[in-house]
C-alpha cells in the first residue's frame, strides 16, 4: 500500500467494500467510501451552487458522524478551506455555547456555516452577527449536483483555544497536511489498509487527522464512536479491538486510558482477544506511567502487549504529530533528580513518559529562555520546525504568545520538555508552572501528586499564578469528601514550600475543560481572580 498522497486522493476511486462504521442509537451504521465520496461530491456541488468560491472558509458545526465527513470532504472538493467547530453537545449551557460560537466565527470569518437542521434556529443569531450564512446539511445535500474543483492551498483552519479560552485559527496548508499524514504512515508502519477505531471528536486535531483523514486516505475499515458513547460505555470501544476481525490502530488521550481502567472490570473482557491491537497512540496531554501500567495490567491477560502503547507528542500548530514511539518499543520512563536532570526510573508516580523521536520531516530542539540549546536531559522549551508546520494563526486577540510562537521557520510551542538519547519527554505548559526552591514546578506535577493521595484524575485541576505579588496554588476539586480538603492543602503546602494555597470544592463540571479533556487553567484562573471560583477557608500556610 502506497503512502497517502493527498487528503482527497481517495475520492477519485473510492472503494464500495470498505468504509467507516458509525455507532448510533440503533447500532453500527456502515458507510462505504464510495457512498461517502458520492455524497461529498453532491455537497460540493450544493456549496458551489450556493455561492461558495475557491478559497472561502466553510465552518462545519456537526457532531462526529457521516454528516461531518460528507460536509468536510464536500467543502474541500468545492475548493473551500474547512474549519471544524465543536458542536453544542460538548458544552453544558447553550448560552455559553452561543457566545463561544460568536467568538469562533469572528476568527474564522466563514462564507457558510453548515449545521444540522434542528440546530439552525439556535445558531441563527450568532451566524448572522458574524456576517455569515447558516445552512443545514439536509437542505444542501438535497440540492446538490456532483462537483469538484482544484482544492484550496489552505486546507484547514483548525480552531484551538487550549487552556486560554481565546479561540485562534491554525492555518494548515495542503502541503503541511500531506507531509504530516505521510510521516504518521511511516512512523506507525501502517502498511496496507490498517483497521482502526476512534472516539476522539472530529473537530479536534487528533480525532480529525488520526481518526478520519488517515483511515480515509488508506480506504481502511474504521469504527467511529462519539466521545459521549466512549465515556458512557468504554467497553463498546474495546470490543472494536477484542472481537474477530477487529481494529488494529487506536488513538486517545491519557484520560481515555483512565476511563477504561475505572469503568471496565476483567470479567467484562471475557472472550476478547487483543493480540491484534498493534498500536494505541496516546497523546494530547501529560501522560501518566501509572495509568499506562494499570491499562496494560487490565488487558494483558486477554492478549494485549505492553509495546502496543504508543506515547506521542503533537499539536495543531504542527498539523498533528511531532514525535512518537516506534512500533514494538516499550515506553521509557524518567524522573528529574535534585539537579533537574533526567534519570531512568520505573513506572512510578510523577515519572515522565518518553514520546519517541521526531517523525519524518520534523525537527525538535529544546532551548533556554534565550533560545540556546540546553544540555541533554535538561528541561527547556520545546521548539519545532519542519515540513508539517502550520502557516501561523488567525486570531482576534493579539496575545504575546500568539505573536511570537511562529518565529522564522520554527514554532515556539510554550511546552516544556527534555531530550534524552534523541527521545522527547514533554513535561507541561510553561505558563502553568512556578519556581519553587529554584526549580520549575508544573501544575501537572501537582495533579499527579494529588492523584497519588487518592484523588481521581478527572476530579482535580491545579492552577498556578500570582495574586498581586503573592504566588498562589489553587486546587479545584470536584465531588470530593470534605475530609479530603485538609489532606490536599497539607500536601500542596509541602510541595510548594510556603506558596499560598487555596482549595475550591464544587460539584461535577466545576472544572472547565477543553473538548479534548484538558483543564482550561487560564480561564479558571481568571474566574478565580474575579471571585467566581470561591475557595474554601482552608487557610494559607506560611
Which residue ranges define each predicted feature?
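Conserved ATP-binding/catalytic segment of the ANL
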Residues: 2, 354-365, 370-377, 381-440
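Gly/Ser/Thr-rich phosphate-binding loop
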Residues: 247-251, 263-349, 363, 371
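Conserved pre-ATP/AMP-binding loop-to-beta segment of ANL
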Residues: 16-18, 143-159, 165-166, 180, ...
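Conserved AMP-binding/adenylation subdomain of ANL enzymes
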Residues: 178-195, 203-248, 263
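Conserved C-terminal "lid"/linker of ANL adenylate-forming enzymes
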Residues: 489-542
Amino acid at each position: 500500500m502506497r503512502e497517502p498522497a493527498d487528503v482527497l486522493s481517495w475520492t477519485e476511486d473510492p472503494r464500495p467494500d470498505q468504509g467507516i462504521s458509525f455507532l448510533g442509537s440503533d447500532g453500527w451504521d456502515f458507510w462505504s467510501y464510495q457512498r461517502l465520496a458520492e455524497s461529498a461530491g453532491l455537497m460540493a456541488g450544493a456549496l458551489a451552487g450556493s455561492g461558495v468560491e475557491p478559497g472561502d472558509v466553510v465552518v462545519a458545526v456537526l457532531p462526529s458522524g457521516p454528516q461531518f465527513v460528507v460536509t468536510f470532504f464536500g467543502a474541500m472538493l468545492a475548493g473551500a478551506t474547512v474549519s471544524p467547530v465543536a458542536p453544542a453537545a460538548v458544552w453544558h449551557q447553550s448560552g455559553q455555547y452561543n457566545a463561544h460560537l460568536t467568538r469562533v466565527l469572528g476568527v474564522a470569518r466563514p462564507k457558510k456555516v453548515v449545521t444540522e437542521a434542528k440546530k439552525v434556529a439556535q445558531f441563527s443569531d450568532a451566524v448572522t452577527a458574524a456576517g455569515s450564512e447558516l445552512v443545514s446539511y439536509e437542505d444542501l445535500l438535497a440540492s446538490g449536483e456532483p462537483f469538484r474543483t482544484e482544492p484550496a492551498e489552505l486546507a484547514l483552519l483548525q480552531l484551538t483555544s487550549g487552556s486560554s479560552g481565546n479561540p485562534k485559527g491554525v492555518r494548515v496548508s495542503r502541503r503541511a497536511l500531506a507531509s504530516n499524514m505521510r510521516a504518521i504512515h511511516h512512523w506507525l508502519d501502517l502498511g496496507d489498509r490498517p483497521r482502526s477505531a476512534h472516539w476522539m471528536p472530529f473537530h479536534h486535531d487528533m480525532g480529525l487527522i488520526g481518526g478520519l483523514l488517515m483511515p480515509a486516505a488508506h480506504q481502511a475499515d474504521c469504527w467511529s464512536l462519539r466521545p459521549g458513547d466512549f465515556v458512557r460505555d468504554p467497553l463498546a470501544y474495546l470490543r472494536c479491538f477484542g472481537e474477530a476481525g477487529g481494529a488494529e490502530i487506536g488513538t486517545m488521550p491519557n484520560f481515555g486510558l483512565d476511563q477504561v481502567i475505572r469503568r471496565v472490570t476483567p470479567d467484562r473482557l471475557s472472550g476478547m482477544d487483543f493480540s491484534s491491537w498493534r498500536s494505541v497512540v496516546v497523546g494530547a496531554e501529560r501522560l501518566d506511567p501509572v495509568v499506562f501500567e494499570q491499562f496494560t495490567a487490565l488487558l494483558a491477560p486477554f492478549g494485549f502487549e505492553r509495546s502496543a502503547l504508543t506515547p506521542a507528542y503533537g499539536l495543531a500548530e504542527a498539523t498533528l504529530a511531532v514525535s512518537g514511539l516506534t512500533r514494538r518499543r516499550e515506553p521509557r520512563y524518567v524522573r528529574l533528580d535534585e539537579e533537574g536532570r533526567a534519570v531512568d526510573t520505573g513506572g512510578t508516580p510523577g515519572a515522565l513518559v518518553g514520546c519517541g523521536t521526531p517523525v519524518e520531516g520534523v525537527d525538535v530542539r529544546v532551548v533556554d529562555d534565550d533560545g540556546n540549546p540546553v544540555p541533554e536531559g535538561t528541561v527547556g522549551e520545546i521548539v519545532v520546525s519542519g515540513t508539517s508546520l502550520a502557516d501561523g494563526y488567525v486570531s482576534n486577540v493579539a496575545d504575546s504568545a500568539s505573536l511570537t510562537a511562529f518565529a522564522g521557520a520554527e514554532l515556539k510551542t510554550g511546552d516544556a520538555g527534555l531530550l534524552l538519547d534523541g527521545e522527547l519527554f514533554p513535561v507541561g505548559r510553561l505558563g502553568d508552572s512556578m519556581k519553587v526552591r529554584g526549580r520549575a514546578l508544573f501544575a501537572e506535577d501537582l495533579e499527579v501528586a494529588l492523584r497519588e493521595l487518592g484523588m481521581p484524575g478527572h476530579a482535580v485541576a491545579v492552577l498556578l499564578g500570582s495574586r498581586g505579588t503573592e504566588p498562589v496554588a489553587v486546587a479545584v476539586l470536584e465531588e470530593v469528601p470534605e475530609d479530603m480538603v485538609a489532606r490536599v492543602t497539607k500536601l500542596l503546602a509541602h510541595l510548594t514550600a510556603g506558596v499560598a494555597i487555596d482549595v475550591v470544592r464544587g460539584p461535577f463540571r466545576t472544572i472547565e475543560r477543553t473538548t479534548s479533556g484538558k483543564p482550561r487553567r487560564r480561564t479558571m484562573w481568571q474566574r478565580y481572580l474575579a471571585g467566581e471560583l470561591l475557595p474554601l477557608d482552608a487557610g494559607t500556610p506560611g
